[in-house]
Amino acid sequence: MDFLFLTFIPSGQPITSAVMFSAGVVGNIMALVLLEVRRRRTSPSLYHVLVTALLMTDLLGSVSVSPVVLSAYAQGKTLVGMSANAEVCSYFGFNMTFLSLSTLAILCVMALERYLSIGHPYFYERHLSKRCGYITIALIYLACVIFCIAPFLGFGEYVQYCPGTWCFLDMSHAEVKGQVYIGFYASFILIVTSTTVVCNIAVLLLLVMMYRRRVSAHSASRSMTEEVEHLLPLATITVVFICCTLPLVLRVYVNLTGSHEERHAADLRALRLLSFHSILNPWVFIILRPSLLKILWRKLHKPQESTLMRGKTLNSAQNSTGCHLQSNTTI
């Protein structure tokens, strides 16, 4: 069946879309509230600016895309059939492309921010500030908008995918311009994701080096704890994003290098995975928030501390007994 111009949804239930919409909205709102509470307790930083932008972008994705799918199911029409000239399909495809690019770009900037804060602290303190974060986010949004309007100018195309409730860039474009455009999209995702992974690995290695050569146990431990609190959610979200975007990148390269035979099922799975990251991101921040990490850290270390205390008590008792016996022998 050709889903490109289908106007009525053949079958399906909106339960999955409704659950995804609810989880995305609730998760992002909860994460933003927790982030705001923490911001009021501590001085805001560049990292908080970037995290807020990431969560706001994910929330924007949930409220701008999911209601369109629910409306399509309610009307029994596909995205192409909901408007005369497929404007709804173009709107959906624009949002999917914009949100995937902007989210990944923000994640990459967050990874670079962590690397500079640990690897080059003097440069970080001297040249980077919250203002740099606001400017960077604005530039990311601007660049993504410019890229996403290219299909309206003849470079690439937003098309409908199975079962008629998804629209995205044409991953099997026959024209050279369309192939170059979608190839650039996939290559950009691959390069930025690789940069993010390299930065996170570099931060991890730097933290290990800091731990090994620390001079003051108290100050080094506190500094490392703060960095781990930032690194752990970022690394987890990076893994989630790789799992969600890599199948789409592979689908694009397969379509570019292989035949142009339509594989709707594989394309649909890749698109669904792409939409999951905006739902999972806020829950990662909620589960791995610093307060919960500190509680888990204390729970894990409490048995060790108890064992050490018992060992010290036993040694003290043995020493006192030995001293007492020695004094009696002397007398």
Segments predicted by a language model, with ranges:
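Intrinsically disordered regulatory tails of 7TM GPCRs
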Residues: 1, 37, 212-231, 291-331
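Intracellular effector-coupling site of seven-transmembrane GPCRs
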Residues: 48-57, 205-248
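Extracellular TM2-ECL1-early TM3 structural module of rhodopsin-like
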Residues: 9-18, 46-109, 117
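Seventh transmembrane helix
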Residues: 243-253, 266-312
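Loop architecture of class A 7-transmembrane GPCRs
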Residues: 2-3, 76-93, 97, 146-191
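Extracellular N-terminal segment of 7TM GPCRs
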Residues: 1-30, 34-37, 331
